[in-house]
């Protein structure tokens, strides 16, 4: 079942044609090593290559992928940050057929030696992943937004995280079959074309109240009795800065980063970690890598051993990434 889920993700979410797995002698689940995209019978434009790379970088499923065309086979580092000024992300050294055969053979992936080779040590790094880059960028946005708005840091943080969640829902919904939230919700209730339009028209707090009611939870809530001071400060503050960050209208190197992210492919576990990461004053990123979380969940909740009655407690819960991953496993069961 773990292979089936991996294949489904590769095909439906990323459009990959094949997946190469690494198998283990013990009871560990097979791990996807790379995705393969077959373009031997169809044209591949530069725009399509950039789209594939953007999605792969955001998705954090495998560190390397291959694109096969009629006259070439190219290997790509899925951890390399997208750059819209570049046409191709394939390493030049890899284009040389003989060297490619030596460095990118199946056996090196089967035994894991590929990742330990000297030539590969500067590539496929978590430090360059969308996960770390997003959190790093959001820390800069949070600091700037708090300074410009003058809001209390906890109010500014809560507002930013709520806006991030809404943006996440909006962009994921754009690719769904219904598309209700992205195309209808804002227009129906606030006569706005999208989330950033809601912010610019000064209706953010009204939207949060509506979402708090519709979602039947406290994640979007600003209590009208207990948080009067906070609500007043939000009403009086120039919140449009948030819209500029979210749609990347600030044309400098610091904030256009938002355009790099595809929330249809960014793992939900990343979003779950944002609040805790922004809460700390440290410049370091302490986000737990998804591969570690997956390993622990596989050990505690094997996919091939579904349970009808299962209880789980995370006694040192921080970002909630383990609980999110565990919930996804229960859904898979």
Regions found by a protein language model. Give the residues of each.
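Class I S-adenosyl-L-methionine
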Residues: 118-171, 175-177, 227-333
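Alpha-helix capping and helix-coil boundary motifs
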Residues: 42-49, 100, 148-156, 181, ...
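Nucleic acid-processing catalytic cores of prokaryotic defense/repair systems
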Residues: 1-96
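Short N-terminal helix-initiation segments at or just after the protein's N-terminus
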Residues: 2-11, 99-111, 262-263
């Amino acid at each position: 079942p773990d292979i089936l889920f991996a294949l489904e993700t590769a095909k439906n979410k990323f459009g990959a044609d094949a997946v190469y797995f690494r198998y283990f002698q013990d009871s560990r689940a097979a791990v996807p090593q790379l995705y393969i995209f077959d373009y031997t019978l169809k044209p591949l434009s530069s725009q399509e290559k950039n789209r594939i790379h953007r999605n792969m970088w955001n998705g954090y499923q495998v560190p390397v992928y291959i694109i096969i065309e009629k006259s070439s086979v190219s290997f790509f580092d899925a951890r390399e940050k997208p750059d819209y000024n570049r046409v191709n992300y394939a390493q030049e050294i890899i284009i040389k057929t003989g060297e490619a055969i030596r460095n990118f053979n199946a056996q090196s992936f089967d035994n894991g030696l590929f990742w330990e080779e000297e030539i590969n040590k500067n590539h496929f790094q978590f430090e360059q992943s969308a996960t770390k880059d997003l959190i790093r960028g959001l820390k800069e946005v949070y600091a700037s937004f708090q300074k410009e708005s003058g809001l209390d840091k906890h109010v500014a943080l809560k507002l930013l995280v709520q806006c991030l969640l809404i943006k996440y829902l909006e962009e994921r919904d754009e690719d769904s079959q219904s598309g209700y939230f992205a195309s209808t919700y804002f227009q129906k209730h606030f006569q706005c074309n999208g989330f950033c339009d809601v912010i610019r028209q000064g209706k953010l707090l009204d939207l949060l109240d509506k979402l708090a009611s519709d979602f039947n939870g406290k994640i979007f809530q600003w209590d009208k009795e207990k948080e009067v001071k906070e609500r007043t400060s939000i009403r009086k503050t120039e919140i449009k800065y948030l819209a500029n960050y979210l749609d990347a209208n600030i044309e400098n190197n610091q904030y256009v980063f938002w355009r790099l992210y595809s929330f249809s492919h960014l793992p939900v576990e990343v979003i779950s970690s944002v609040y805790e990461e922004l809460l700390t004053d440290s410049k370091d990123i302490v986000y737990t890598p998804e591969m570690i979380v997956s390993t622990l969940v596989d050990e505690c909740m094997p996919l091939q051993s579904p349970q009808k009655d299962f209880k789980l407690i995370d006694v040192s819960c921080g970002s909630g990434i383990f609980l999110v991953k565990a919930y996804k496993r229960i859904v898979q069961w």
